[in-house]
């Protein structure tokens, strides 16, 4: 779908060139051409630039800017898309949004993504100060037409200051339709390394968070977990008393969304290596507490929040996960290198 007829023509030509027959290219505004249809997957790369100078000729370049003020176009687009999804269907979009000094970016976006009958995950990939954003916008515009950079920059920055725009955030938005329970909204910083495909990772984290975020500790302790594939430990050591001593440790994921988990202490490291998909978390924590001669309550208070966080970012998985359920009990986990 595209409003631009040339874009539709190019897409159709590329489909024919690559012998793809299962693609339909339609011209129209937003969802109007498919208003009677529902989808399992919607992927969108909208014109998400936030124009610092609404009166600028840049508005003619609709591939970059919607022509609407601020970030309302993309926020409204996401709200519309939610109603075009089948149950468990996904919507993916890259977009930018306004950030102000008076309000946290997550608090500002949350109302826009509420009441959609969808779980929502927003990953911030970066942010630019108002000065940097306006400067970059002016530089890009100069490549398209002869413009007075200084005058354009001054107008753009004045517009941002007038509307109290301190910075512009950019990121990825994913919705998954779910009408059978209360929905959840998650905001995160994206990992720096997104060089590999991570679609399956996104789907997996939706499943994990939807199931376990609201699970009481008592039920969480009954679960059996294992270290997820492609997890490694990176340790930093320093010389002390004639030997190397570990002074910092972190877990990292080598595939998908390559998150890292810093500040891994010896107690957390040990319990993670013992996750074998065979014993419950309570059983493992009980044994660890006895071996360390520590009160079980203290071990649980210390480790449970960290283990929940590891689960939310995919470092550990429930034993019922498809890629773990067939793993033999003697399998070793890639928890260190």
Model feature map: region roles:
Residues 3-12, 17-146:
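S-adenosylmethionine
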Residues 175, 256-329, 333-337:
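Long, charge-rich, low-complexity alpha-helical segments
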Residues 116-269:
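Rossmann-like AdoMet/SAM-dependent catalytic core
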